[in-house]
């Protein structure tokens, strides 16, 4: 409701009210001349009312009578400060002394009369405005109160609560009481703090899930489990057959068995249920899911079967190792350890050879145990075939197993049926096992040397090709050098073939680790999108250059950018192109301007030669344009940088122009002043020689004018004009003669003139300097015809000077 009321109560500014009142007073004075005395008295009354208002003004409250509020509001409306006074304490104080409209004579009409302006706002609006002022005042008081509470803190009561007493020194006393509880012990010369049991248990606490592929601690645990498994596989058959377990050493065997059982049990209860697995492409790390997955797997069944305590039968049947045969069922951990170990080794084929050799030795160990059992069954020393009981039992039986499996002759013939059947089975198993191991060994060694065999095959094919086409020996030597260096440095011929089998994300990760630090240093690519640089890393190609190979030659069109990965290159220059200007090392970049240059700016400006073996990364122009299609912001940045680099390149090229032919006989000229360049640019078709001649003639003319007077100066000017006209005619005739001699039309030469005088820079070219040196100083009857023709060699021209006699006039 207040909003609608305040919108109606619009008050005009004070200045406008004053102007209206003054105009109304003038009208009244015009109609009533006797009102001047009344006007002065009215002004005095207004001043008196203003003083009384200033002394009696008080803040408006909700308890004031309505009559007082209405009187104050009427005065405020007359002063024009109803809704613009922000001070809540002086809400009823007027800011002007303009007389109220009510005091005017109702019979008088003026600009502010009721007929000329809308009717005044009703009293209810004034009351609402006063209420709004009161509301603003209370809101400000409330804001100040809450601000004070925020600064001083929220108090529960208006009375200040007593300050809380400072904490006593009880906690330090407790800390001092706890300090003596810490225990220390000395280790040699060091004082070591004894860790509490709870802290130690926290540190050795197992994680909720274990990544079997990346966790190295899990790999160490698998090594411990594998050792326990190998102990059982080797010594259970040995203790079962050979008489090595006796009553004197039985307690040692039992201790070793208990340790192995503890390792098995701990692995089954605490390690295997925490291994992560993949289901539907997601890695499962939830503890409940991990335990459920392990309990439903075949590995859990084998682990339970391997830990069944058949050792209890020792109480009824004695210490027979046969009851521990189920410990050999935990073979899954053994193969898992082999798989993880091969995945982290640099040369896994070495471990594969060792593992295959271990398989062979273990089979021979089992065969030796079986042979001793057969000899004991037949009776030791009863026949020539069985073990005779002499020497070390295990070594003699192992020797017999080696000769049997490898099918070495010279063994005693079996005598009984049991011996014959046993020997036949032994021969068959020996041939099968031995051939399998030999084949596996061949595969391991073949896989280890597969890359080298491929390298040898490629090199042999290339040499055969070169011999077939009678390639020179020097070229063949360079080809062999490239093959040998590539193999020695990379152990492969083309590393891109290896990366093709990997996914794009893995290729990008490898490229970032190898080449990102190099390409991020290129000034041309600084400020570009990082993703664009990542895309370029995937497109880089590695190229190997031999010592003395030209990476790029001067004058050829540049289509690639080069980044030095390994080695050095030299930039050659000078008159003969053999001077080393600079040597670029690993991490340097060259040729980047050619990627973005256009209109002839992409030509190579120098020869670049590999100083030694140089491995360079290349990026061609086409590939860069394909990448920039998706990165318009980076393209704008690259284009801007390319223009700056091209300008710098043009300045350096202008600073050292090439000197050819007759220009080599004269010293290089100084740089042309800017003022002279401006003058030369505005002369149109005038040549440099003509300007110099005019300058000398003007100097001579000034000297003659100072000596001979003004008349002689005028005559000299006329003569000078005549000489210039004659010189123009002679030049035109000489050009016509030149065109006739060369069989050209006289219209071809003027077409070439605008090209020579198109810009002031053309004045600095060498042909003009040569023309200046050979022009005659005085008048002669000889004319010089100078022409330039392209040479057979790229980047060179042939200067031709012909001398002809002028015709006599």
Swiss-Prot record:
The record marks 442 as: Occludes the pore below the central gate. One of its GO terms (biological process) is visual perception. The record marks 434, 438 as: Central gate. It holds the Pfam family Ion_trans. One of its GO terms (cellular component) is intracellular cyclic nucleotide activated cation channel complex. GO terms for molecular function: cGMP binding; intracellularly cAMP-activated cation channel activity; intracellularly cGMP-activated cation channel activity; protein-containing complex binding. Residues 243-249, 318-320, 372-393 are extracellular. Changing residue 525 to N: In ACHM3; requires 2 nucleotide substitutions. Residues 22-31, 44-53, 716-755 have a biased composition (Basic and acidic residues). The chain crosses the membrane at residues 219-242, 250-270, 300-317, 321-335, 349-371, 394-420, 421-445. The keyword Manganese does not apply. Residues 348-447 are annotated as: Ion conduction pathway. Changing residue 199 to K: In ACHM3; uncertain significance. Belongs to the cyclic nucleotide-gated cation channel (TC 1.A.1.5) family. CNGB3 subfamily. It is linked to Stargardt disease 1: An autosomal recessive form of Stargardt disease, a retinal degenerative disease characterized by macular dystrophy, progressive bilateral atrophy of the foveal retinal pigment epithelium, and accumulation of fluorescent flecks around the macula and/or in the central and near-peripheral areas of the retina. STGD1 patients typically lose central vision in their first or second decade of life. Achromatopsia 3: An autosomal recessive, ocular stationary disorder due to the absence of functioning cone photoreceptors in the retina. It is characterized by total colorblindness, low visual acuity, photophobia and nystagmus. Achromatopsia type 3 patients manifest severe myopia. Forms heterotetrameric channels composed of CNGA3 and CNGB3 subunits with 3:1 stoichiometry. This is Cyclic nucleotide-gated channel beta-3. The lineage of its organism: Eukaryota, Metazoa, Chordata, Craniata, Vertebrata. The gene is CNGB3.
């Amino acid at each position: 409701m207040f909003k609608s009321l305040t919108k109606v109560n619009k008050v005009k500014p004070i200045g406008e009210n004053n102007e209206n009142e003054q105009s109304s007073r003038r009208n009244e004075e015009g109609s009533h001349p006797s009102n001047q005395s009344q006007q002065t008295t009215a002004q005095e009354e207004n001043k008196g009312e203003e003083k009384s208002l200033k002394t009696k003004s008080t803040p408006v409250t909700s308890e004031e009578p309505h009559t007082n509020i209405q009187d104050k509001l009427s005065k405020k409306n007359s002063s024009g400060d109803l809704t613009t006074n922000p001070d809540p304490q002086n809400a009823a104080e007027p800011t002007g002394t303009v007389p109220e409209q009510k005091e005017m004579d109702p019979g008088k009409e003026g600009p502010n009369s009721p007929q000329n302006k809308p009717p005044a706002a009703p009293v209810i609006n004034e009351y609402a405005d006063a209420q709004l002022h009161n509301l603003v005042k209370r809101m400000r008081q409330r804001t100040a109160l809450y601000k004070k509470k925020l600064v001083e803190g929220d108090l529960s009561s208006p009375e200040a609560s007593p300050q809380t007493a400072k904490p006593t020194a009880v906690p330090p006393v407790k800390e001092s009481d706890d300090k003596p509880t810490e225990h220390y012990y000395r280790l040699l010369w060091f004082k070591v703090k004894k860790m509490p049991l709870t802290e130690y248990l926290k540190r050795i606490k197992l994680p909720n899930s274990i990544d079997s592929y990346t966790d190295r601690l899990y790999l160490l645990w698998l090594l411990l489990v594998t050792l326990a498994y190998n102990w059982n596989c080797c010594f259970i058959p040995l203790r079962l057959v050979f008489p090595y377990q006796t009553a004197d050493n039985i307690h040692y065997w039992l201790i070793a068995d208990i340790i192995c059982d503890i390792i098995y049990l701990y692995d089954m209860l605490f390690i295997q249920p925490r291994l992560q697995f993949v289901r539907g492409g997601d890695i499962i790390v939830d503890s409940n899911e991990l335990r459920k997955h392990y309990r439903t797997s075949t590995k859990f069944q084998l682990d339970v079967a391997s830990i069944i305590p058949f050792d209890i039968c020792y109480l009824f049947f004695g210490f027979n190792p046969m009851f521990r045969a189920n410990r050999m069922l935990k073979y899954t951990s053994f193969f898992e350890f082999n798989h993880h170990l091969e995945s982290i080794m640099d040369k896994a084929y070495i471990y594969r050879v060792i593992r295959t050799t271990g398989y062979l030795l273990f089979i021979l160990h089992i065969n030796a145990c079986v042979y001793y059992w057969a000899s004991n069954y037949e009776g030791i020393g009863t026949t020539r075939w069985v073990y005779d009981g002499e020497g070390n039992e295990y070594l003699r039986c192992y020797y017999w197993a080696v000769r049997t499996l490898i099918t070495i002759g010279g063994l005693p013939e079996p005598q009984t049926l049991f011996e014959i059947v046993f020997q036949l089975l032994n021969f068959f198993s020996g041939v099968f096992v031995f051939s399998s191991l030999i084949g596996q060994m061949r595969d391991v060694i073949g896989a280890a040397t597969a890359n080298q065999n491929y390298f040898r095959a490629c090199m042999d094919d290339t040499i055969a090709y070169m011999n077939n086409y009678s390639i020179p020996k020097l070229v063949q030597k360079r080809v062999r050098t490239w093959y040998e260096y590539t193999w020695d440095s990379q152990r492969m011929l083309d590393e891109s073939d290896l990366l093709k089998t990997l996914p794009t994300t893995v290729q990008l990760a490898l490229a970032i680790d190898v080449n990102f630090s190099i390409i991020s240093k290129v000034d041309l690519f600084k400020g570009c999108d990082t993703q664009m640089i990542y895309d370029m890393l995937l497109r880089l190609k590695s190229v190997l250059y031999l010592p003395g190979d030209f990476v790029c030659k001067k004058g050829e069109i540049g289509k690639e950018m080069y980044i030095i990965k390994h080695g050095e290159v030299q930039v050659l220059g000078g008159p003969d192109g053999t001077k080393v200007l600079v040597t670029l090392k690993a991490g340097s970049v060259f040729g980047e301007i050619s990627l973005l240059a256009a209109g002839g700016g992409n030509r190579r400006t120098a020869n670049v030669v590999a100083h030694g073996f140089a491995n360079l990364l290349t990026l061609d122009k086409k590939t860069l344009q394909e990448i920039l299609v998706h990165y318009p912001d980076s393209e704008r940045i690259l284009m801007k940088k390319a223009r700056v680099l091209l300008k710098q390149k043009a300045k350096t090229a202008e600073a050292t122009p090439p000197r050819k032919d007759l220009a080599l006989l004269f010293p290089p000229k100084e740089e042309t002043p800017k003022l002279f360049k401006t003058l030369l640019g505005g002369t149109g078709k005038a040549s440099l020689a003509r300007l110099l001649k005019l300058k000398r003639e003007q100097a001579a003319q000034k000297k003659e004018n100072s000596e001979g007077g003004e008349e002689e100066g005028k005559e000299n000017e006329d003569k000078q004009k005549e000489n210039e006209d004659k010189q123009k005619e002679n030049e035109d005739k000489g050009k016509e003669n030149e065109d006739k001699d060369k069989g050209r039309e006289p219209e071809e030469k003027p077409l070439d003139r605008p090209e020579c005088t198109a810009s002031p820079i053309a004045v600095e070219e060498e042909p003009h300097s040569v023309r200046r040196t050979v022009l005659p100083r005085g008048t002669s009857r000889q004319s010089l015809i100078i022409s330039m023709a392209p040479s057979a060699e790229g980047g060179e021209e042939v200067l031709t000077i012909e001398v002809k006699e002028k015709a006599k006039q």
